Structure formats: structure tokens, C-alpha cells
Amino acid sequence: MTSSLAGQLFRMRNIDRVITSERSQKIRASFLFDGRQAADIDMQTIFDIGCDGLGELRKMNRKFDSFASTLFSPAIKDLDRVLQTREENERLDESIRSFLFLMAPYFLTKPAGKALEWLVRRFRIQEFNARDLLAAILPYHETKAFLTMLTIITFETRDMELFGFLVTQRKARRLLDRGTLMAQCVRDRALMTFVCSSVFRACQMGFEYAGLHAFYAMIFSQYITSLASVGGADVQFVLPFVLDGLQLDGDAQIAAYMVLGTLATRVTLSADALDKTLCAVAQRRADLRAMTMCVVQLVQTQEAALT
């Protein structure tokens, strides 16, 4: 009964989206073209553009191969997702999520733009997958490409409290500079949680890259330094993200060392928190030199907790 009711609610919720889907055939959202140009380009042409982009991405990374038989398959070319069941859309969302995080390192390249154009036109990722799309491209928030994508993203009402500030940026056609993003993260911990969770999800999915590690280290360290003071509640919020970062591999773990070092200069941890942190540092080490430097910094800054 519950499952049946959920299915009915899902179909009712999509009635407006079916209408919107029909209307969008006249008003085209586009990543590569302006609205007037996009309206004159048919679905087959956009599909060809997308497949061309995917082909170039496959040369850069063979992990893109699998999408030739899914998101970029001729068999799915005429699919309208608003007419699909909840289960079918969930499978589609999972595939789109994987593609977006895999695509992230190549976001500023022409092939990625071509592939995204197809996903925007056919699957309306700017509407149905807005959170995953933002999560994947947020490290590029200071670029024109990010702003271009932001101009076509549709935020659901439930997400406006979290992403409403982006609407202001979009209306003003302003790049999202680091200071603005950081100020919003300090005002709203939910946004900082979204940022950090997005980074960890990409790493756990195996889609990490150097720019992502740098983004995590920089934005989290700056978040800590931007706090007027670091109290117990702040430590309780920040430390779990640091400990999660220490469980990652390679450069992601080194980035976590940097964040931990910043935290250690701002606050004296409790004996229990310091013990958990040192255990986490010692448990997995991606780089012995980086780990040693981290431990030395902890000893120097946390002397009171060690005595």
C-alpha cells in the first residue's frame, strides 16, 4: 500500500514536469548555446554533439567507455524521463551521478561541454540532478563555465534555503568568488556539510583528482580561519570531517593533514579528541613525511592536552 501510494505521489508530482517538458521543446536550456540558438538545434544534432564529446573524453579516460551504452546510447535517445517510473529514474540518476563525478576533472574542456549539452537537453540534469551537478563542478566556482551552468540550474523549493545565495549570484551574473562562498559557508553549516560531503563522495567513488584535493584543503582550512573563534561546538562540527579525510588515500589524506594543522593552530583539543585524532593519523599513512610533519605540529600546538 505504501509503495503504491508513493508511486501515485511520484506520478502526480511529475504532471507539471511533463507540461514543462513539452514547453521546454520551445524554450531550450543550454550549456553551449544561447536560448535562441538552442531552440533551433534539434535533438539528433545535440545527440551527435554529445557523442562526439564522449568520444573525446574516452580518449582521455577509458572509464568513460561504459557510458557509450547507457547515457549516450541511441537506444535511450528518445527517452523522456518524466514519463519513467521512480525506479527507472533512480537508476538513471545513479548513472548520471557517476558520469558527473567522473567528468569533473575535465569540466573546463570542450569535450566535457559537448557531453554535458546532451545531458542537459535529454535528461534535464540542470533540473533533476541539480545537487549532483553542483557537487561535481563546485571546485570551479570562480570560472565562467561554472557561472554559465549556474544560469540554467533549476533549484527545487526545498533547496532554496541552502542554495538561494547562488540565485543572487546568477541574477547579477557575478562569478562566485572564494570570499562569497566562504562567507556563506560560515553563515550556514549545512552548506559546508554539502561541500565536504561532495568531496568525500567523489573520493569514495574513485573519482578524485588533484584539483579536488586542493579545493578541499583550501576551503576547509579557510573555513576554520574565518571563524571568529573556535569553540567546542565548532570542533564537534569540524573534527568528524577531518577524521573522515584521514581515512582516505593518497593526496586526499595529505589534504586532510593540512586541514588538521589549521585546526590545531586555532584551538586546543580535548584529551579525548586529540587521542582519536592521533590514532586516526597513525592508522593510515599515505605519505610518511607529511604524516610526521602533521604529528610534529600537533605536538607543538597541543602541548596542554598532552600533559
Please name every model-derived segment.
Residues 1-307:
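Extended alpha-solenoid scaffolds built from HEAT/ARM-like alpha-helical repeats
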